[in-house]
Amino acid sequence: MNMQAILKQAQNMQKDMMKAKEEVDNTVFVGESSLVKVEVYGTKKIKSVKINSTEPIEADEIEMLEDMFLVAINSAFEKVDKMTEEKMGKFANIPGLF
């Protein structure tokens, strides 16, 4: 394979990698835990936080609600990580692309 063909192949791989990254970044992932629903972008920036309760939150329920937020956020982030690995993992062992 000549040098020009190698460079062309590397450019195509880089384009594919950027397309995969853009797809992950623009995807919205949802994490939920009982009363809490969190939406995050693939960039791990939080899009929205919802508390699904028609009842007022009592003072003694605050710690439980905080735990629900942690579970929901971590769940959404795990989904981001999983999709990132699925989309970007094939590029991990290619030297010079990062």
PLM features: what roles do these ranges have?
Residues 1-30, 79-98:
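Long amphipathic alpha-helical segments used for membrane anchoring, targeting, substrate engagement
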